[in-house]
Amino acid sequence: MDGENHSVVSEFLFLGLTHSWEIQLLLLVFSSVLYVASITGNIFIVFSVTTDPHLHSPMYFLLASLSFIDLGACSVTSPKMIYDLFRKRKVISFGGCIAQIFFIHVIGGVEMVLLIAMAFDRYVALCKPLHYLTIMSPRMCLSFLAVAWTLGVSHSLFQLAFLVNLAFCGPNVLDSFYCDLPRLLRLACTDTYRLQFMVTVNSGFICVGTFFILLISYVFILFTVWKHSSGGSSKALSTLSAHSTVVLLFFGPPMFVYTRPHPNSQMDKFLAIFDAVLTPFLNPVVYTFRNKEMKAAIKRVCKQLVIYKKIS
């Protein structure tokens, strides 16, 4: 009976995205450009917020935390996907597969809490401006960050707990380009229908629940601003619209996946590419182009880098 707790499958084989050479080439260029842009954009945001005194505020602290998470989000699956595009045998070790699942759920959990924290930050800024710095103190910001990481890691460990007593002794082919927990459960030697249902409900409930919390909070904020509208609110509303855009980009793909009655493998792959490559790229774009202070800070950072290169 001891063998039931040990996997005899040492690696998993990915079917990948497509067998078309032309589409693979397009995906290689598309994914590589967006990956480099995502890394560069998010590093610029983290560096700008860290070094520029003009951005030392709660809102930008949370934004830098989100960009740090996005650095991980675009690095968990994208590099291997790009590396495997033209490989005939796309494999990942059992440990590598578990690591992918762990980090995917950690990053997803942390990002959800950070988006809630950013919504709360905008609520305080717009509805209680006189108490903003008192409520959104450094201690409060660090508490948000600690809660985000605690819940993210806890959620991921809870998801992985489903795999503890499962044996993988036969098929090892995943119709994907990364390790997805529901697909991995289907490869187990035992009946995992209930486990698949629990995993889907757990992730779907958290995703949909968080989305509606954010939706209600943004509607409440907009209603409050509309009641006390003034010219000084335009800047805050612009920031709020940027937050709303990021929320839609983040929750759109997973909500579509978890709420559909009939999953579609090709559609899931497309949404996974969107989630893994495009969303981390669009986040810094949305926040940068819609925020004058952030654009000014990035320009100052670029000037400093140019001066540093000239000196060196």
UniProtKB/Swiss-Prot annotation:
Glycosylation positions in this chain: N5
Record GO terms (molecular function): G protein-coupled receptor activity; olfactory receptor activity
Disulfide bonds: C97-C189
Entry GO CC: plasma membrane
Residues that span the membrane, as ranges: 26-49, 58-79, 101-120, 140-158, 196-219, 236-258, 270-289
Membrane association type: Multi-pass membrane protein
Major site of localization recorded for this protein: membrane
Superkingdom of origin organism: Eukaryota
CDD domains in alphabetical order: 7tmA_OR4-like
Cytoplasmic side: 50-57, 121-139, 220-235, 290-312
Keyword RNA-binding in record: no
Localisation: Cell membrane
Keywords in alphabetical order: Cell membrane, Disulfide bond, G-protein coupled receptor, Glycoprotein, Membrane, Olfaction, Receptor, Sensory transduction, Transducer, Transmembrane, Transmembrane helix
Keyword Transcription regulation: no
Pfam assignment, any one: 7tm_4
Classification via InterPro entries: GPCR_Rhodpsn, GPCR_Rhodpsn_7TM, Olfact_rcpt, Olfactory_Receptors
Extracellular-side segments: 1-25, 80-100, 159-195, 259-269
Function: Odorant receptor.
Stated family: Belongs to the G-protein coupled receptor 1 family.
Protein name: Olfactory receptor 4F21
Organism, as annotated: Homo sapiens (Human)
